[in-house]
A protein has these predicted regions:
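Enzymes that bind and transform nitrogen-containing heteroaromatic metabolites
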Residues: 1-242
Length: 242
């Protein structure tokens, strides 16, 4: 039987995270992780500048209180030449939408959207330019990520930068929605059983864990930048995701 390749009608999603040498994205207190170098911050900004939207969870917003804007002149010019807004859309992802309404994020000059559930949509509507609802049929308190990404794609958001935290990244890996992964390995050891990692959630059994292809290894000073592509079978008419 002939199979026909199909296009994934979801955005291209790239996870960008910095972690300690032992694989922690924050310490055990979940304090804001500021151990990345100035080079890492420039790298993060460059990745964000390529995106139509930036996604992050409520925990990340609680920890940092702000988001990273595109500020470098060459990156702003590049977006302008591509006909894009100067700043990508900043999308907070939270099923409950219990956020700190006083966070500095809400006064930053960036477009703000909320991705949530029916219950979460009742909160802070006046703080966001757009509120998207994508609710899991199995659990109304959780986001249906496949539906959410289809909505984002329909709104012409074709490239996403995923900035964490680990629960959000785990949900997107579980839904097979991550395409690329950038990890900055930083020269410190954090340890701690309760310290968060790049991918949290319930985890994957080794036999069905997402597989990666290493695209690039880039040392810079005492850090190492790792770039991976997520391996997946070509989407065809015979294996299209439900």
């Amino acid at each position: 039987m002939q199979v026909t390749p199909l296009l994934r009608k979801v955005p291209h999603a790239t996870v960008i995270l910095a972690m300690s040498a032992d694989g922690k994205i924050a310490d055990a207190t979940r304090a804001p992780a500021r151990f990345g170098s100035a080079i890492d911050k420039l790298h993060l900004e460059a990745q964000i500048s390529q995106a139509d939207a930036v996604l992050f969870g409520a925990g990340t917003l609680w920890a940092y209180g702000t988001t990273l804007k595109v500020t470098q002149a060459d990156l702003l010019n590049q977006r302008q030449q591509q006909g894009k807004p100067l700043q990508p859309v900043q999308i907070v992802c939270s099923g409950s939408a219990k956020l700190d309404a006083e966070a500095r994020f809400f006064s930053q000059p960036v477009p703000r959207w909320l991705l949530t559930t029916t219950i979460g949509a009742c909160w802070h509507r006046d703080k966001f330019e757009r509120v998207l609802v994508a609710e899991s049929k199995e659990d109304a308190s959780k986001i249906n990520w496949q539906e959410a990404f289809e909505q984002l794609y329909a709104l012409s958001l074709e490239r996403l930068a995923i900035l964490g935290g680990g629960e959000l990244v785990a949900s997107l890996f579980a839904a097979d929605l991550v395409d690329e992964l950038w990890l900055t390995v930083c020269p410190l050891i954090l340890g701690g059983a309760m310290a968060p990692t790049p991918v949290e959630g319930v985890g994957f059994l080794a036999g069905v864990a997402p597989r990666l292809e290493l695209l690039d290894v880039r040392p810079a000073d005492e850090e190492v930048f790792l770039h991976y592509r997520v391996k997946r079978k070509p989407l065809t008419a015979t294996n299209e995701r439900e």
